C-alpha cells in the first residue's frame, strides 16, 4: 500500500528506455478497426484522474495522444497527488456527477469501491457491446494481479490493471561479491556470504555490514528500514511485508472467526509469531541508516540508490530505477533481487495457496457507473491493455500486467539490467499478495496506527503495543459492525 509520497518523478518516464517511445512511434495492430470503432464518438472527450506516477505519465504523454490520433476521441488525463486524486474520484462517484470517465483504483481500495457499486462491470459491458470489443484485447492475457480487480461473486473484471509490482529483497552485488568482504564474513560467521533465505541469516548479514563499515568509517549500513514514526508507510511495512514472512497473514485478522484480531479471540495480530516479527524488524531498524526513522517507501528507495545500504526490502517500481537509472542511482549494475527472508514453512504455505510471502502492489483504471461516455471509455481501457502497447509501456515505466509482455525482446533486455526482476515477477509473483479484501481498510489502519507509532518511538513496549493494537482493532471492527 502506498497512499502518498510515492516516487513520481516524471523524468523517469520514457527516459529509462534506451530508445524513447513517443505517441507517433507507437505501432498499433488493426489501426483500421480502431478508426472505425471510434468514428461513432466524433467530438467526444473522455476524462480521467490518476496519481502522478511514471506509468500514469505514460498514459497522458503517449497513450492518450495515440488513441486520439486513431479514434478521434479526445482524452484528458489529470495526474495529481494521491490524496487529491482519491478525493476527486471519490467525490465524483459518491455524487454520481460523471466528471470522470476513468479513475485510478489502488489495489487495496477497490474492495470499498465494489461494496458501494461505484464501478462498471467491464466483462459484462464488453459482452453486451461486441462492436466495440477490440479483437486483440483479452482478459485471459492479464497476469494474476488482475484478480484483485474481479468481483468476489461473479469473477468479472472491474478495473484494467495499469501498474503492478512486488516488494523484493534487494542486495548490493558489488558488496556481496567483494572477495575481501566475503573472506571477512566467512571468518566471522563460518558460512559463505550470499542473499539471506531466513531472518536469522538476514540479521547476521545486516549486523556484519553495519559493523564492517562503521569500523572503516564509511556510511554504509547493513539494511534499509521503512520505519517512519508518524507515517503509515511503517505500519504497512510491518503488516504487509514483514508479518507475512513469519506466517501472519491479512494483518492477523480472521474474517471467518468473527473478525478476530487478538489471540484470545482466535486472531493473530498479537500472536507469538507477530511479536517475533516485530522484534526482528525493530532490531533491523536499529542498525539501518539514521534516516530510516523518517523513511517512507520513497526514502527507502533513495537510501538504497545512494549506496547507503547493503540490502533491504524495496518496492519493485523503485527497484527498477535503482538498478537502471544512472541519473538517480549510484548502484546501477550492482543490484541483485531475491525473495524476502522467510521463517520455516512460509514458502511451502505460499506455494500451496495457503499464505503469501510479501506484498503485491499496483493499480488499475476503472469506469465509474456515473460516466456519460462509457462506451468511449471502454475503448480506451482496452487500448491500454493491447499487447503491443504493453510491451513499450513495460520498458518505458517498468511494470507488467500482461503475461505476453514477459516474452518481449525489449523486456527481456531490461530484465537483465534489473537483475532478473521481471523473471521473479513472472515466475514467483503468485507467491505475493495484495492487501486483504477489507472494505474497512482505511478505518482499521487509522485506528491502530497511532499505537504502532508509539511502539516505534519507544513509548510502549513492542509486545504490549501489539496487544493494544489487537484490542483496538476488535473495538473498531465492532463499532463498524463487522464484529458481533
Question: Whereabouts are the PLM-identified features?
Answer:
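Long, aromatic- and glycine/proline-rich binding clefts that accommodate carbohydrate-like moieties
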Residues: 28-34, 45, 51, 335-344, ...
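Immediate post-signal peptide segment of exported/extracytoplasmic ligand-binding proteins
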Residues: 23-47, 68-69, 153-156, 210-219, ...
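Hinge/lid segment of periplasmic solute-binding proteins
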Residues: 24-40, 107-168, 238, 336-341, ...
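Extracytoplasmic "Venus flytrap"/periplasmic binding protein-like
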Residues: 62-142, 179-180, 311, 327-330, ...
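Extracytoplasmic/periplasmic substrate-recognition and gating elements
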Residues: 65, 150, 155, 175, ...
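Short, polar/charged alpha-helical segment
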Residues: 31-37, 54-74, 174, 448, ...
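Short helix-initiation/N-cap motifs at beta->coil->alpha
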Residues: 80-88, 197-201, 292-306
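Glycine-centered hinge/linker elements that transmit conformational signals in sensory
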Residues: 201-210, 241-294, 336
Amino acid at each position: 500500500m502506498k497512499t502518498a509520497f510515492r516516487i513520481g518523478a516524471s523524468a523517469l518516464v520514457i527516459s529509462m528506455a534506451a530508445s524513447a517511445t513517443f505517441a507517433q512511434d507507437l505501432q498499433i495492430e488493426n489501426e483500421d478497426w480502431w478508426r472505425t470503432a471510434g468514428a461513432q464518438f466524433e467530438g467526444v472527450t473522455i476524462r480521467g484522474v490518476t496519481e502522478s506516477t511514471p506509468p500514469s505519465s505514460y498514459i497522458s504523454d503517449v497513450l492518450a495522444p495515440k488513441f486520439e490520433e486513431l479514434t478521434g476521441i479526445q482524452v484528458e488525463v489529470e495526474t495529481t497527488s494521491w490524496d487529491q486524486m482519491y478525493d476527486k474520484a471519490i467525490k465524483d462517484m459518491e455524487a454520481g456527477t460523471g466528471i470522470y470517465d476513468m479513475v485510478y483504483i489502488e489495489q487495496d481500495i477497490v474492495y470499498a469501491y465494489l461494496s458501494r457499486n461505484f464501478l462498471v462491470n467491464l466483462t459484462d459491458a464488453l459482452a453486451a457491446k461486441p462492436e466495440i470489443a477490440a479483437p486483440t484485447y483479452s482478459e485471459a492475457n492479464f497476469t494474476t494481479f488482475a484478480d484483485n480487480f474481479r468481483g468476489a461473486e461473479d469473477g468479472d473484471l472491474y478495473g484494467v490493471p495499469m501498474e503492478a509490482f512486488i516488494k523484493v529483497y534487494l542486495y548490493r552485488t558489488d558488496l556481496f561479491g567483494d572477495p575481501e568482504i566475503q573472506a571477512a564474513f566467512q571468518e566471522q560467521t563460518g558460512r559463505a556470504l550470499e542473499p539471506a533465505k531466513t531472518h536469522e541469516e538476514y540479521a547476521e548479514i545486516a549486523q556484519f555490514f553495519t559493523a564492517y563499515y562503521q569500523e572503516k568509517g564509511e556510511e554504509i549500513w547493513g539494511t534499509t528500514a521503512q520505519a517512519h514514526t508518524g507515517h503509515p508507510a511503517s505500519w504497512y511495512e510491518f503488516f504487509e511485508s514483514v508479518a507475512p514472512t513469519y506466517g501472519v497473514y491479512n494483518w492477523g485478522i480472521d474474517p471467518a472467526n468473527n473478525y478476530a484480531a487478538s489471540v484470545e479471540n482466535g486472531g493473530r495480530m498479537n500472536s507469538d509469531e507477530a511479536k517475533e516479527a516485530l522484534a526482528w524488524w525493530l532490531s533491523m531498524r536499529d542498525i539501518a541508516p539514521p534516516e530510516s526513522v523518517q523513511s517512507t517507501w520513497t526514502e527507502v528507495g533513495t537510501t538504497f540508490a545512494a549506496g547507503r545500504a547493503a540490502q533491504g526490502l524495496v518496492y519493485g517500481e523503485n527497484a527498477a530505477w535503482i538498478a537502471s537509472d544512472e541519473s538517480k542511482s549510484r548502484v546501477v549494475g550492482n543490484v541483485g533481487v531475491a525473495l524476502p527472508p522467510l521463517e520455516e514453512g512460509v514458502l511451502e504455505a505460499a506455494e500451496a495457496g495457503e499464505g503469501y510471502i510479501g506484498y503485491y502492489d499496483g493499480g488499475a483504471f476503472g469506469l465509474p457507473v456515473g460516466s456519460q461516455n462509457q462506451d468511449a471509455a471502454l475503448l480506451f481501457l482496452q487500448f491500454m491493455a493491447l499487447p503491443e502497447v504493453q510491451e513499450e509501456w513495460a520498458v518505458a515505466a517498468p511494470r507488467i500486467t500482461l503475461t505476453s509482455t514477459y516474452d518481449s525482446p525489449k523486456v527481456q533486455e531490461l530484465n537483465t539490467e534489473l537483475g532478473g526482476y521481471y523473471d521473479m515477477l513472472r515466475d514467483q509473483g503468485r507467491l505475493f499478495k495484495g492487501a486483504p479484501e477489507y472494505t474497512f481498510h482505511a478505518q482499521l489502519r487509522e485506528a491502530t496506527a497511532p499505537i504502532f507509532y508509539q511502539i516505534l518511538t519507544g513509548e510502549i513496549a513492542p509486545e504490549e503495543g501489539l496487544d493494544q493494537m489487537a484490542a483496538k482493532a476488535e473495538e473498531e471492527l465492532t463499532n463498524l459492525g463487522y464484529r458481533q
